[in-house]
Amino acid sequence: MYNETPIKRRPSTRIYVGNVPIGDGAPIAVQSMTNTKTTDVEATIAQIRALEKVGADIVRVSVPTMDAAEAFKLIKQAVNVPLVADIHFDYRIALKVAEYGVDCLRINPGNIGNEERIRSVVECARDHNIPIRIGVNGGSLEKDLMDKYKEPTPQALLESAMRHVDILDRLNFDQFKVSVKASDVFLAVESYRLLAKQIRQPLHLGITEAGGARAGSVKSAVGLGMLLAEGIGDTLRISLAADPVEEIKVGFDILKSLRIRSRGINFIACPSCSRQEFDVISTVNELERRLEDVTTAMDVSIIGCVVNGPGEALVSHIGLTGGHNKSGYYDEGERQKERFDNDNIVDSLEAKIRAKASQMANRIQIKDTTE
């Protein structure tokens, strides 16, 4: 199976968010953010666990008040995934959640306050061995930058980021990552390109406020795909007006499509036409639903006829090619004698995929123990 990626990652420094390495060649971390009221501890914990179940490496939680900070303490004690506290306006909240074991502090240069407040946050982060994310956003730039540039521009986002990078440099603090997000794809992409040339710290990617599930996924895939293909980016979040679980799925799908990082099954499926010998669309949809729990990276081709089916099956771990009444089954590119009844394809294919995933996972485990 062809699984090489031509992408060469941008060199960067290494930080840790909890036990998750960021930068310096580490796997690109996929993040999301809770959309519950943080003071609703039970609901927030449930959402974090749902995110962790689908593969979230890191979860960000908004902490807008001191009451939310107290709730954060309870939330942190109940979950395993590293948590980032999202801090705006009141720097004292950052100091409080640091006491409660937060794994990373996100501060917004546009509203966190003057240099003295930033110094307080940095010294607290240093004392607790916590990294910081400088999170610039085109929708909340500092007033003087808006006066200077009249609107969010790549140069404005870069200047906002660099003035705070300079502050952290003066304070001899290097445990940080930076983001320069915007809702416009080209604005965000150019901002990240400029920033990538200026610093060596890890970059957190995102198209902010991208939109609903469909449009937001497309916008994020285009913008982040451009950057990732250039080797830019060490962690990412897909911002959707949708269930945060979908953000994680889309994030992994983008990385999977670029062969940067794979988790779970990569379905290769035809859009179907009158040549299909079974219902391709319903088959793929049902298998995606049933096999969400499979984390082994593997390619599965499901093609409704013999035009492209055999060719796709040759480069898949498991392949299915539509045939009259019964469809052909391939394992590691080799046609098997066994054929699947078209009326029972989903059950048959699910069993084969699960067995293959288990076999591949065991193979990887054995390899790891012998190296």
Swiss-Prot record:
Comment on bound cofactor: Binds 1 [4Fe-4S] cluster.
Keyword terms, alphabetized: 4Fe-4S, Iron, Iron-sulfur, Isoprene biosynthesis, Metal-binding, Oxidoreductase
Domain of life of the source: Bacteria
Pathway(s) the chain acts in: Isoprenoid biosynthesis; isopentenyl diphosphate biosynthesis via DXP pathway; isopentenyl diphosphate from 1-deoxy-D-xylulose 5-phosphate: step 5/6
GO BP annotations, alphabetical order: isopentenyl diphosphate biosynthetic process, methylerythritol 4-phosphate pathway; terpenoid biosynthetic process
Needed cofactors: [4Fe-4S] cluster
Top-level EC class as recorded in UniProt: oxidoreductase
Reaction(s) this enzyme catalyzes, per UniProt: (2E)-4-hydroxy-3-methylbut-2-enyl diphosphate + oxidized [flavodoxin] + H2O + 2 H(+) = 2-C-methyl-D-erythritol 2,4-cyclic diphosphate + reduced [flavodoxin]
Any Pfam family the entry gives: GcpE
GO molecular function: 4 iron, 4 sulfur cluster binding; 4-hydroxy-3-methylbut-2-en-1-yl diphosphate synthase activity (ferredoxin); 4-hydroxy-3-methylbut-2-enyl-diphosphate synthase activity (flavodoxin); iron ion binding
Binding site for [4Fe-4S] cluster: C270, C273, C305, E312
InterPro entries in the record: Dihydropteroate_synth-like_sf (IPR011005), IspG_bac (IPR016425), IspG_bac-typ (IPR004588), NO2/SO3_Rdtase_4Fe4S_sf (IPR045854)
EC number: 1.17.7.3
Protein family (similarity comment): Belongs to the IspG family.
Function per UniProt: Converts 2C-methyl-D-erythritol 2,4-cyclodiphosphate (ME-2,4cPP) into 1-hydroxy-2-methyl-2-(E)-butenyl 4-diphosphate.
HAMAP family per the UniProt record, alphabetical: IspG
Protein name: 4-hydroxy-3-methylbut-2-en-1-yl diphosphate synthase (flavodoxin)
Lineage of source species: Bacteria, Pseudomonadati, Pseudomonadota, Gammaproteobacteria, Alteromonadales
